[in-house]
Amino acid sequence: MSFTIAIIGRPNVGKSTLFNRLVGQKLALVDDKPGVTRDRREGQARLGDLDFTVIDTAGLDEGPRGSLTARMQEQTETAIAAADALMFVFDARAGLTPTDRSFADFARRANKPVVLVANKSEGRHGEAGALESYALGLGDPVGVSAEHGEGMSDLYDALRGVMPEPTEEAEEFDDDDIIESEDISQRPIRVAIVGRPNAGKSTLINYLLGEERLLTSPEAGTTRDSISVELNWQGRDFRIFDTAGLRRRSRIEEKLEKLSVADTLRAARFAEVVVLMMDAQNRFEEQDLRIADLIEREGRALVIAVNKWDLMGRQSSLIAALRTDADHLLPQVKGMPIVAVSGLMGEGVDRLMTAIQDAYAIWNRRVPTAALNRWFEQAVDANPPPAVSGRRLKLNYVTQAKARPPSFIVFCSRADAVPESYLRYLVNSLRGFFDLPGTPIRITLREKANPFAHKRKRKS
């Protein structure tokens, strides 16, 4: 029996992008302008072993009776009536709006299973918006990036909870198991190579490709655009983005260079692993730290490549000193891989490509629930949270909200009272316990509802 899911939400939250992702074709027009979708559109979707009909709807919005907006809403209401379940989509980067809250009530009144989808949830702003959506009372949000295909395995798990059991025994699926117009299981790892101008980014890519595909020059700023190339390295596919060097914004005067920096930032956001290239002769300058901080804030896995190693006499003691400096200067990505390379000579390139694949695997890591609970109990017992104003803070339990990067929610009695230092302790403890070097780890505190609070209020 066919199962139908309607994708609903306010205009311009990415409903059509998600629809195209699920059906594997660009059947729905996508544009940044709200209201591009006017009619409901149906397609056959497949996610892992789940087959279903999906309906793309116009954005839910109010309009005068008889107007085009009102007719669009009528089409949406018809789709909801025909559906067996709803996917309520909101823009996690923008956060919840009054319209989102209004139509969350609308979705509840439909009296059908609802899967809450936090689209555009990549990056720190997206994560905050996704967590904010718990206030809607529609259950746990599923963080996805419909544009980049992230979070599809989490969406699969959520849809399995509202759909009839598949006829065959279900398997576990990764994000790559969604069927697209091309076999996404072959999708390359997206890698951005960033750094200060003239660090040797293009030289490294030319070595990997075996040809002088990108212009190189001792003059800083030869690369103006973010350039994408595909690469197969020992049987694994990669898409590599070479970027213009990042300088301090205050020193940028040419309009062209301003655009280059913006392009570099976009490439870093689009990537899954970011390689920060540093010149071995000028390492860990202020701008390197700024770039690394940007990468961490965007939630990307980080690998440091120390280039022009051959010019430094290949001193092994220098790498040890770099590791110490990196852990001190960048504690938020402690243990990140540091690889000495010579892009010109090809030295260390095998180690770099292995480090990229390892970082990608860690970035995608999901921690088994039993092991997560065991770590949490040990960490809190070893170092309980400090009392605040004479009141003890109680940490109840922890759950993993998502991967890419690994993100966790700790439920506690008073979220606003837990010191930042204790949060850092939990992050470092978790990183060490589960061996998660070099990837951002997000731990968000959320207060556990007190079932007796309303009773106390009534007595007073």
Curated annotation (Swiss-Prot):
GTP 2 binds at residues 195-202, 242-246, 307-310. Gene3D superfamilies: 3.30.300.20, P-loop containing nucleotide triphosphate hydrolases. Pfam families: KH_dom-like (PF14714), MMR_HSR1 (PF01926). GTP 1 binds at residues 9-16, 56-60, 119-122. Residues 365-449 form the KH-like domain. Residues 3-167, 189-364 form the EngA-type G domain. GO terms for biological process: ribosome biogenesis. One of its GO terms (molecular function) is GTP binding. Keywords: GTP-binding, Nucleotide-binding, Repeat, Ribosome biogenesis. PROSITE patterns: G_ENGA. HAMAP family: GTPase_Der. Associates with the 50S ribosomal subunit. GTPase that plays an essential role in the late steps of ribosome biogenesis. Belongs to the TRAFAC class TrmE-Era-EngA-EngB-Septin-like GTPase superfamily. EngA (Der) GTPase family. NCBIfam families: GTPase_EngA (TIGR03594), small_GTP (TIGR00231). This is GTPase Der. It comes from Nitrobacter hamburgensis (strain DSM 10229 / NCIMB 13809 / X14). The lineage of its organism: Bacteria, Pseudomonadati, Pseudomonadota, Alphaproteobacteria, Hyphomicrobiales. The gene is der.
